[in-house]
């Protein structure tokens, strides 16, 4: 339970436990999760595993974010009921492992229909490499039938909301003046950036 988790981490932090395989940085991050300061991001694919992690997060009373979630469409209603957001790549619709046998391009459509908040990323690269291709993922989701505004939110305001970032992700009074001006539809593959402003400063 949560009290035991606190006790274990406290024991580690004061140096009385030697059998942990985590660093102090790991435990500090976990403390923030348990305190509700940040969400726990879990990479998961199979529908059964998604249901299990939903039950776990509810029992521990922690905020959860699902990452990847190839079979989320199979349990979309349960995810929506738990009010858990999903970060996924709409283009990642081909089974790559046995954990994602039920991958489908309809994943984002079914999640949206269930009312699940989504954020998109581009999965074909390490870390943030090729992150700019998230617009391509969003554009493809629109081609698959997702509402345009929903797709735009999935690469702008939704990521900010999911991680509790204040003042970014939207254009509103008091928000950071971060703005990209495109020469056409930003979700079209051949569109280019005309101008970029960060904190209102032309880059």
Where are these regions (language model features)?
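Polyanionic/metal-chelating signatures
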Residues: 1-64, 192, 198
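Long, well-ordered mid-to-C-terminal structural blocks that present hydrophobic/aromatic surfaces
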Residues: 59, 63-67, 84-87
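C-terminal cap of metal-dependent C-N hydrolases
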Residues: 173-203
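His/Asp/Glu-enriched, well-ordered alpha-helical/loop segment
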Residues: 39, 77-80, 85, 89-93, ...
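Catalytic beta/alpha-barrel core
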Residues: 41-45, 63-71, 91-96
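Glycine-rich nucleotide phosphate-binding loop and flanking beta-alpha elements
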Residues: 48, 94, 187-188
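Amphipathic coiled-coil/heptad-repeat helices and related helical stalk/stem segments
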Residues: 26, 46-49, 72, 104, ...
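Active-site environment of divalent metal-dependent phosphoester hydrolases
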Residues: 47-51, 69-76, 126-128
